[in-house]
């Protein structure tokens, strides 16, 4: 069953209906659902689908030829075009009088095996686009390759595309459609454990508990997810050992460049290059305090929840897992799970605020959201604000998120209001997010202030319906 991607499908179908040449670039990290999106889109349409393989030019050209000829003749073909130029010319002619889709999946594999393919595509597009109704789709999992060799200004195909789509992991709302059999609370835990990558969500069984799902995947050496982070690095980068060391450093609390460099034993210049690649892969993110464009206070953290959970709990327990001690390891994880979920809940709350903005329900229409941390000069202490967002120099929203098994008390609201005093806004609105709820004192104060919104986790879940 295909779930989600409504916006992407709407765009693709709109381009399909244009009845003229279209060239769409689709890219995104592995397992995110690009192939599923393409297959769902081309279903019941006249389409040639070809997936490149990590092989030589001869093998890929043979496979490409078969895909095109079988579409054109309706019979299995043994003929191979003499070149990609001849194959593409045939595909363009097939679409002279009717809409035909040509989808080339894993394009980087094909292009790496044939160095002239990009230029051949460019020439074919320029020659035939005005007299063809072909809809060309190039799709790739190597994001750096797609960005540098397809989308970049110096790439041969630059300026030819009519649309591009970077396919991102699902947000929390979309993930919940995969997890309908779970309780509302368990949906949050599963999102925190695997994130929004469809292939990882499919490893979760919504008829089992969170404990059973963790044991069956991360604590099972024979499972797909147990080896996934290292396998993914081996597929994406040339020196997986160094990348693994950097991710491990970040996962163990070394968040600043100098700390990562010291932990890994490489210069900051070297680490910077590796971190840049990890950011492009969607594994690591770089944050600066909200409102500060360039800051020495920048920190790095793991963005992908599957990577974050794996690196926090699997490596240190690898020996016990290998000996089949999943019950013991789970007890260790369970004691830290609510603490781990704190950052996940902030992510869910951030998505909720964006949803309020997009539906016209935000009291202050911010232009962006982020975390803030820094020095409180009044108290000479380092402080944090979970979420803040500015509309303009006069107005902003502030939020605090608490994932804990107790009601949020008045002191949390008072602390947030106090910290907002470090900024010079004249109009402010506050959000308190709570897993469980709020004390009577907190609720009464919020009502009295008039510029406070109290949101429980259940409120967030109900907003999906």
Q: Language-model features: where?
A:
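Phosphate-binding site recognition
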Residues: 1-330
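A cross-kingdom feature that marks ATP-driven nucleic-acid transaction machinery
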Residues: 290, 299-465
């Amino acid at each position: 069953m295909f779930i989600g991607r409504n916006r992407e499908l709407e765009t693709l179908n709109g381009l399909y209906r244009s009845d003229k040449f279209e060239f769409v670039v689709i890219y995104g990290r592995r397992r995110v659902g690009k192939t599923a999106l393409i297959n769902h889109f081309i279903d019941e349409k006249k389409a040639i689908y070809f997936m490149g393989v990590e092989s030589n030019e001869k093998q890929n050209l043979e496979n490409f030829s078969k895909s095109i000829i079988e579409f054109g003749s309706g019979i299995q073909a043994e003929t191979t075009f003499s070149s990609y130029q001849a194959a593409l010319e045939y595909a363009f002619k097939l679409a002279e009088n009717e809409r035909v889709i040509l989808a080339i999946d894993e394009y980087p594999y094909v292009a790496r095996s044939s160095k002239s393919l990009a230029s051949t595509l460019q020439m074919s597009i320029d020659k035939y686009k005005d007299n063809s109704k072909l809809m060309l789709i190039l799709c790739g999992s190597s994001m750096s390759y797609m960005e540098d060799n397809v989308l970049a200004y110096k790439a041969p195909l630059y300026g030819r595309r009519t649309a591009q789509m970077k396919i991102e992991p699902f947000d929390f709302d979309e993930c919940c459609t995969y997890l309908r059999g779970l309780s509302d609370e368990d949906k949050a835990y599963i999102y925190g454990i695997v994130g929004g990558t469809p292939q990882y969500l499919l490893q979760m069984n919504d008829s089992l508990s969170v404990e059973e799902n963790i044991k069956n995947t991360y604590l099972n050496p024979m499972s797909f997810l147990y080896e996934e982070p290292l396998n993914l690095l081996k597929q994406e980068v040339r020196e997986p050992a160094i990348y693994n060391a950097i991710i491990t450093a970040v996962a163990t609390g070394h968040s600043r460049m100098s700390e990562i460099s010291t932990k890994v034993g490489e210069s900051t210049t070297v680490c910077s290059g590796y971190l840049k690649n990890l950011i492009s892969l969607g594994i690591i993110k770089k944050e600066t305090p909200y409102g500060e464009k360039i800051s020495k206070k920048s920190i790095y953290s793991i963005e992908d929840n599957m990577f974050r959970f794996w690196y926090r709990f699997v490596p240190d327990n690898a020996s016990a897992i290998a000996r089949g001690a999943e019950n013991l390891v789970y007890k260790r994880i369970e004691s830290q799970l609510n603490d781990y979920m704190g950052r996940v809940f902030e992510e869910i709350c951030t998505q909720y605020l964006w949803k309020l903005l997009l539906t016209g329900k935000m009291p202050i229409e911010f232009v962006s959201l982020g975390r803030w941390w820094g020095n409180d000069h009044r108290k000479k202490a380092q402080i944090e604000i979970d979420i803040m967002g500015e509309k303009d120099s006069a107005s902003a929203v502030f939020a605090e998120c608490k994932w804990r098994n107790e009601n949020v008390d008045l002191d949390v609201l008072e602390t947030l209001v106090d910290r907002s005093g470090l900024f010079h806004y004249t109009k402010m609105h506050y959000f308190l997010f709570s897993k469980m709820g709020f004390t009577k004192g907190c609720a009464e104060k919020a009502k009295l202030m008039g510029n406070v919104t109290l949101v429980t986790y259940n409120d967030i879940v109900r907003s999906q319906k």
